[in-house]
Each structure stands twice: as C-alpha cells, then as structure tokens.
Regions:
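Cationic-aromatic interfacial patches
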Residues: 32-136
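Bacterial Sec-dependent N-terminal signal peptides
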Residues: 1-35
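Alpha-helical structural elements
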Residues: 7-8, 25, 50, 63, ...
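Conserved catalytic/binding loops enriched for acidic/polar residues
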Residues: 141
Length: 428
C-alpha cells in the first residue's frame, strides 16, 4: 500500500541519443534503456533496406530527408519538441553541396533515420514512460514499414496528417495548443503536450474495457466499448508517498480483504499509537503476527521496549467494514504493491484535496465497479452487511482488465481544457 518515489530518478526521460527528439514524459526504471532500443531499431531498418545508405542513396531520398527534417524542426504544433539544432544542422548540410564528406554520410544517414523513426513513434503512441508498463508493445516494425513504404506522391506533411491521432480529446488539446498557448507559457505548454501524449498512448493501445485513474484529478473512470460507464472520485498518494504511474491489468478482486500493514507504516504510525493506547489494537481490529504469519498474543509483549528499528512483528487488520481497505481490493500486477480498493473512510471523498494515501488508490464507487467487472459473482447486499472477520475470498476475473494510473495535468470537458495542479511537481 506504500510506494516511495526515487528522488534521484528524473521526472522526465533524457534524450535517446544526442540527436533524438525530446518530449515531456516520465521515467521508468523498468524500461529497457532507450539508447539501446533506438540503436537496435536503426540497425533493423538498414538490415531490411539492404543498403548501408538510405537518405544519401538518391536525390529523391535526399529531398525526402529535407522534408522530414523540416517537419521535425517545426513540430511544436503537434506537441513534439525536437532537437532543432541537430535537425537544422543536418538539413543545411543536405542542401549545401559538398559539406558532407563520404565518411560522414553513413553517420548522418543513421542520425536522420533515428530522428524520423522516433518522430513516427511519438506521433502515434506518444512518449509517455509509465513507472511500470506491461500494456504497451513494440511497434518498431510498423514504423520501419511506414518509412520504407510511403505512398507514391504523398508528402511528409500529408503522411503526418494521415497518421496523426484522431482521438476526440487529443484534437481538442491539439487545437488548444495551436490557438491559445503562447510559446512563452512553458508550463501550460508542457501540460497540454503531456495530455496529448497520453491520448496518443491510449489510441495506440485501444482496449474494449479499461480503467483510467488520473492522479492530478484524483478521479477514476471505467469505460466499456469506449462508453463511460462509471466515474468516481479517488484518494491517491500524498506528496510524501506519491502514487506511481502504472499501465497494468486487474487480475482478480478480493472481497473482505485483510490489510497486511506495510512495515514502514507499522513502525512509524501504528506502533506509537499502540504504545500510547493499550486498547488500540483491539478497538481497530488488528492482530500482531510474526514473520511466519502466526498470530502473537499482544498482551504478553513489552510494548515500551520497541522502536522503529527493533520492532520484529507485523500488524494485520481483520476483515470487515472497518478495515482500512474496506470490503473490496482490486489487485493489479506491478512491483510496487499498488492496488485499487474501497475504504471505511468515506469522508475523504467529499474533500477537494484528496492526495492523502500512502500510494494506493481508494475508490469512491468500488461496489459499482466490482459489479461491472464480475456481474454474476458480486453480491452488493452481502458486501454492505459484512461483519468483522468475514471470510476473505479471491475471485479471478474471466479476462484481465487494463488499468492505467496516469499523471495527466489537464482535463478535457467538451471543447474546454481545464488545467490541473501539478501536485507532485512532475511537469517541471
């Protein structure tokens, strides 16, 4: 239930190579190094091309390279921020006879290919880097095909227009970017661009049913066949314990879950309360367990002798309506022990500021969501009437449901763009 972001890690990913397109995205310690992937894709391109030169192989291709580099230089209206210096330098060299010697052609050729392939990638799937992502798949072969098999007579501008995202919210953001934002307003620009890149990601990873839990909005939505079926408020991680961005799948739902309190919460928050109030454990339905999961008689423990550093036990909260996880837990695959869950503290959903959890996502309408995902196996009456120590049950979903825990600092309502507070300071 707790997640601590590595403060040394960058909030945005660095350039793939010194000449690759940059964008606004978030880092992921679980992603393969981008430089290695880009080198591999470029090499794959030349293997398929059967020629060590592509752009310098003919005047036609040189002209095409100039078109691409011009597009990359001026792609700000698409929310794709490029390394203009590299693009300009190569383009000027291309149109200036004799400025590229034979030995440099191979290097320049690959630089152009890397720039163009990365542009095609960002254009169609965005450059969002979730902290953990098991949904997105490689489309490198598609981008290579698009570059090698351009339609006869189709300009680069026409190709980009054809491949550009057609998502409704994306188009609203794109038009807003074009019409409303001054280049000098870098914060708003970054927020809109981040929103555009998320919409590109969703379009590239289209799913029938899915959940989006957006951290800055502290809201979650469930979509079925692209129709919004449930929208609810959430409580997400605090600034101290931020919720990570995750693209994963809900695999099962637990009814009447136990809460195995993370050790850091146990020693920093619960232990002082137990030492101060002798009946705290009983009043809040906690058991003390050892490392093997065996329940310990807490009345025989010398509580005053324990500190954060030497407390050898764990706390486990019994099932029931007063459990911190409520009566439902939605498990999703990720390395951070993050999940969605109900809660016994409903009052938090009435607040505007809902960045209060240790990292997990509390749902305002968990019963409705569970009923949608497991219509024949969820009895809302039983869940509402559950008592202390009700038996916990894990129910596998017939098919896993994608869930995207996102950091989108803008919201689209109709044709209006709403800017959200950058609660974790990731946009800067």
């Amino acid at each position: 239930m707790i997640y601590i972001r590595d403060k040394k890690g960058s909030a945005y990913y660095n350039a793939l190579l010194c000449f690759l397109i940059l964008g606004f995205s978030f880092s992921s310690s679980y992603a393969q190094p981008d430089t290695l992937k880009k080198d591999s894709v470029v090499q794959q391109f030349y293997t398929i091309n059967h020629d060590p030169l592509f752009w310098f192989s003919s005047d036609k291709n040189r002209n095409r390279a100039t078109e691409w580099l011009t597009m990359i230089e001026t792609a700000g209206y698409l929310g794709i921020v490029s390394d203009k210096y590299a693009a300009v330098q190569i383009r000027v060299a291309l149109i200036s006879n004799g400025t590229i010697d034979e030995n440099s052609k191979f290097q320049r050729d690959r630089q152009i290919t890397g720039l163009v392939l990365n542009f095609l990638k960002v254009l169609q799937e965005g450059n969002i880097k979730f902290d953990y992502d098991e949904v997105n798949v490689s489309r490198d072969s598609l981008y290579i095909h698009q570059l090698l098999e351009s339609k006869p007579g189709e300009s680069v501008s026409q190709l980009v227009s054809r491949l550009d995202c057609k998502d409704r919210e994306y188009l609203v953001l794109k038009n807003f970017l074009k019409d409303s934002i001054s280049v000098k307003d870098t914060i708003k620009y970054k927020k809109v661009v981040t929103g555009m890149n998320y919409r590109r990601y969703f379009s590239a990873n289209q799913k029938k049913d899915y959940i989006i839990a957006n951290i800055p909005a502290a809201e979650a939505s469930y979509y079925s066949n692209d129709f919004l079926k449930i929208k609810m408020r959430t409580v997400v991680g605090s600034k101290k314990n931020p919720t990570p961005t995750i693209a994963s799948y809900i695999t099962n739902i637990v009814t009447f879950p136990h809460w195995n309190v993370p050790h850091s919460i146990a020693v920093k928050e619960l232990l002082p309360k137990v030492q101060k109030h002798e009946n705290y454990l009983e009043q809040n339905n906690y058991d003390v367990v050892n490392a093997k999961g065996k329940v310990i008689d807490d009345s025989k423990l010398n509580w005053k002798s324990y500190t954060e550093k030497n407390f050898p036990y764990f706390f486990r909260q019994s099932t029931g309506p007063r459990n911190a996880l409520g009566v439902l837990k939605f498990n999703l695959q990720n390395p951070f022990s993050i999940f969605l869950h109900s809660t016994s503290l409903q009052s938090a959903f009435t607040k505007d500021y809902r960045f209060l959890s240790h990292g997990c996502v509390r749902l305002a309408k968990p019963l409705e969501l569970a009923k949608e995902l497991l219509p024949d196996q969820i009895d809302i009456k039983v869940l509402k009437s559950g008592k202390k120590n009700t038996e916990s049950k894990t129910i596998d979903l017939p098919r896993k449901i994608p869930v995207f825990i996102t950091y989108i600092p803008v919201k689209v309502i109709g044709k209006k763009v709403i800017f959200l507070k950058d609660i974790y300071g990731l946009v800067n």
